[in-house]
A protein has these predicted regions:
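Active-site beta-loop-alpha junctions enriched in small/polar residues
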Residues: 10-12, 44-46, 70-74, 106-108, ...
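Active-site mouth loops of central-metabolism enzymes
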Residues: 11-24, 74-82, 121-128
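Single conserved hydrophobic/aromatic residue that forms the stacking wall/gate
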Residues: 255-265
Length: 265
């Protein structure tokens, strides 16, 4: 299995927490990404939205467009409205040659609300999962037809946070809905990366690799602290610096993930 290594600009600048790198320039982010040996990047708030401008800034640094976050609301939205909502970003990604588009379910999310504790997030069980799965599959099929596969990002603070919720979404959706396995978010939510790879390896078309500091995780009060509070406390760290076994993840990925060429970062 061939893996391409990309980077996320959130390592330099957090769009939800301007105090974390808000004054770091896009030039610094991209030049250091390439200097570190990565061949691609995701988008972020500082990236151009014009396709020609985006292509130019990427080419200047010899970087490909890996992907970028899309704030979806299909769990409480109709398909036609969602198709209209995603259209500009999908067209941008298509023109610049993104490998995938990252779908995060953000209806009533608390991921970017520092005044809301983690426990106040929406719960998947409160929605019609079967209907959600049908809409999500249709959206993913549309993205695939446009040449930009969709990858679903389970995320802390959203309606799809836990391993059980992720399992339910995978069961309710068709093959067009790829899975972005975020190793750090899954462990933060109490999940098992090895189990998810074994169950859903054929659906994984993108990775986010980060690590978790066990001591910080153990001290989190989910009824009092927000996701952004946890970020500021340092719950996340770089792969190899925390509690996640990446040797095991890589070995299992070689067994269970069939797609030969996908970005991994």
């Amino acid at each position: 299995m061939k893996l391409r290594l990309g980077m996320s600009p959130i390592s330099w600048s957090n769009d939800d927490l301007p105090q974390l790198g808000g004054d770091t320039s896009l030039e610094t982010c991209l030049s250091e990404t390439r200097e570190a040996g990565f061949v691609g990047t995701e988008t972020g708030g500082k990236f151009p939205k014009d396709p020609d401008a985006l292509a130019t800034v990427l080419a200047t640094h010899d970087l490909a467009l890996v992907s970028g976050w899309y704030s979806g609301t299909l769990i409480n939205n109709d398909l036609d409205s969602e198709l209209a909502q995603i259209a500009d970003q999908l067209a941008l990604f298509k023109q610049v040659g993104a490998s995938v588009i990252v779908y995060g379910e953000t209806f009533n999310t608390v991921q970017n609300r520092q005044e809301r504790p983690l426990s106040s997030r929406p719960k998947l069980a409160d929605f019609d999962v079967a209907a959600y799965g049908r809409r999500l599959t249709a959206l993913a099929e549309h993205c695939a037809d446009e040449g930009v596969p969709l990858t679903f990002h389970h995320h802390m603070g959203t309606a799809v946070e836990t391993e059980a919720e992720l399992d339910a979404v995978m069961k309710a959706t068709g093959e067009a809905v790829g899975l972005l396995l975020d190793t750090g978010h899954l462990v933060f939510a109490g999940g098992d990366n090895a189990a998810v790879i074994a169950k859903h390896g054929s659906r994984i078309n993108h990775f986010h690799t980060k690590d978790i500091r066990a001591d910080v995780l153990a001290g989190i009060d989910r009824d009092a602290e927000s996701f952004l509070d946890c970020v500021l406390k340092g719950v996340f760290t770089v792969p190899g610096d925390g509690m996640i076994d990446y040797d095991d993840i890589m070995k299992l990925s070689l067994i269970h993930i069939s797609e030969p060429t996908r970005p991994f970062h």
